[in-house]
Amino acid sequence: VKVRVYSFWIAFRGAWRNIPAHMKRIIPFLAFLLMAAGVLAADTRCYELRIYSANEGKLEALNVRFRDHTCKLFEKHGLTNVGYWVPVDKTDSRLIYVISSPNRAAHAKSWKAFLNDPDWKKAYANSIKDGRLVGKIDSTFLNATDYSPTVKPVIPKDIRMFELRTVTTAPDRLKNLHARFRDHTCEIFENQGMTNVAYWTPMDEKKGKSNTLIYIISHMSKKQSGDRLEITKWNLDQA
């Protein structure tokens, strides 16, 4: 949205003096309409939530591999690094992250290119010389809901706690849950000092397309329930 509006103003900046007065009065209004249209546009990107369960003692090495190699290679092949987290509970050796791409077909193409990249193959081989880093991988493809904030990488000004929450509804009740979040819950979260980060539903039925809401909120306090996560420090530096 910002790029579209910025380009609009750059196009007119050089010739501003030659624009009729009545046009000058409506240009800001047109710019507002462009911004409004962008805000209302649906987020059609493909998101992938990936959860890696690291083998015993291997989480730090896994973080190093992502920090030094994987994140850069993702971007090289068209995959956007959205966020990386580790659980607050230090006995939980999972790395949880979200990547995105324009659509699922593009996502699959980018992932294949990433796996076939010689730099990735070299980094992977070097990282497992003392044993494999990951014991289990869980992947869920996601669509953003119509009430989700714009999902984008950010550099938090303060250390925050994050909650990854999954809600499973009774049959045919997901639309009611969406209505409650859209009309009430998201606003109440913000009023209570929580930040709405992202809201998604799975793309695939086997992952809960018809009855599952997955969302992330953040807090300034650790005194919250749920699956609490810390954003990885190396992601703060690179986001």
Spans of features found by a protein language model:
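Short secondary-structure capping/junction motifs at helix and strand boundaries
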Residues: 24-25, 121
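Short, positively charged and aromatic/hydrophobic N-terminal segments
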Residues: 2, 17-19
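Serine/threonine-rich, low-complexity intrinsically disordered segments
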Residues: 12, 21, 28-29
